[in-house]
């Protein structure tokens, strides 16, 4: 697997458009396309091997709001899609899995309702990614609005024995800021967990990608990249496959 396969392009949906937030702030929005479906297709055409879809309206409102767009994306592309944003009940997860997405990212619910979370994992073994959003070294939930007392590793260890797919580790302070990823934090997490870790937040250059790619041996599976792809700092089609 080369660098290109390691990159998971992000398509963040807000108000029906493909956007990017700066450091998780719902007011700091850049719109990159009016049609998220064609944006998703474009990444596939440029050689993406998987996609990361986020329903930002869902994340802030607590339930998925853009299911039809997700359905259209899954129908249009032939690569696996992972989805996150507002999955805070079994029903919400069921409705998203039925669109044909490969994996679902769950953060707040895992923390707030263990029983419901375990029910989801039992129903969809190997399909659930636990989302770990870290803000100032502690895990944040509810669309990054509320901080918990857990460190990322303490939080992850609560779920590492379940039949999940793995973890998505986002450093919110770096997200959309292209200041470089949290290499140490990502490595530390991956080294200490049984399941794979997907990194996210802060990637701004091919150099950053290579640093994360070097962590594959510790269990880092890939990296979600948004802004750096949209701003042309990283050209997917130019990365080795």
Swiss-Prot record:
Main localization of the protein described in the UniProt heading: cytoplasm
Pathway: Amino-acid biosynthesis; L-histidine biosynthesis; L-histidine from 5-phospho-alpha-D-ribose 1-diphosphate: step 4/9
EC number(s) from the headed UniProt entry: 5.3.1.16
Catalytic reaction list: 1-(5-phospho-beta-D-ribosyl)-5-[(5-phospho-beta-D-ribosylamino)methylideneamino]imidazole-4-carboxamide = 5-[(5-phospho-1-deoxy-D-ribulos-1-ylimino)methylamino]-1-(5-phospho-beta-D-ribosyl)imidazole-4-carboxamide
Superkingdom: Bacteria
GO biological process: L-histidine biosynthetic process; L-tryptophan biosynthetic process
GO molecular function, one term: 1-(5-phosphoribosyl)-5-[(5-phosphoribosylamino)methylideneamino]imidazole-4-carboxamide isomerase activity
Compartments it resides in: Cytoplasm
Active site: 12 (proton acceptor), 133 (proton donor)
GO CC list: cytoplasm
Alphabetical UniProt keywords: Amino-acid biosynthesis, Cytoplasm, Histidine biosynthesis, Isomerase
Database matches in PANTHER family: 1-(5-PHOSPHORIBOSYL)-5-[(5-PHOSPHORIBOSYLAMINO)METHYLIDENEAMINO] IMIDAZOLE-4-CARBOXAMIDE ISOMERASE
Family of this protein: Belongs to the HisA/HisF family.
The protein's name in its UniProt record: 1-(5-phosphoribosyl)-5-[(5-phosphoribosylamino)methylideneamino] imidazole-4-carboxamide isomerase
Organism: Persephonella marina (strain DSM 14350 / EX-H1)
């Amino acid at each position: 697997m080369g660098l290109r396969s390691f990159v998971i392009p992000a398509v963040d949906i807000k108000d029906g458009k493909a956007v990017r937030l700066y450091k998780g702030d719902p007011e700091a929005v850049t719109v990159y396309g009016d049609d998220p479906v064609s944006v998703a297709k474009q990444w596939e055409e440029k050689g993406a091997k998987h996609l990361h879809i986020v329903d930002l309206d869902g994340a802030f409102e607590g339930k998925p709001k853009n299911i039809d767009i997700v359905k259209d994306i899954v129908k249009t592309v032939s690569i696996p899609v992972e989805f996150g944003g507002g999955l805070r009940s079994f029903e919400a997860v069921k409705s998203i899995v039925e669109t044909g997405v490969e994996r679902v990212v769950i953060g707040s619910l895992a923390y707030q309702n263990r029983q419901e979370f375990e029910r989801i994992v039992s129903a969809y073994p190997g399909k659930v990614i636990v989302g770990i959003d870290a803000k100032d070294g502690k895990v944040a939930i509810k669309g990054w609005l509320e901080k918990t007392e857990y460190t990322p590793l303490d939080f992850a260890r609560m779920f590492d024995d379940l039949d999940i797919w793995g973890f998505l580790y986002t450093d919110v302070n770096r997200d959309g800021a292209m200041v470089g990823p949290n290499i140490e934090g990502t490595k530390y997490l991956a080294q200490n967990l049984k399941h794979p870790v997907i990194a996210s937040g802060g990637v701004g250059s091919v150099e950053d990608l290579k640093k994360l790619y070097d962590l594959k041996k510790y269990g880092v599976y890939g990296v979600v990249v948004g802004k750096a792809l949209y701003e042309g700092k990283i050209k997917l089609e130019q990365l080795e496959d």
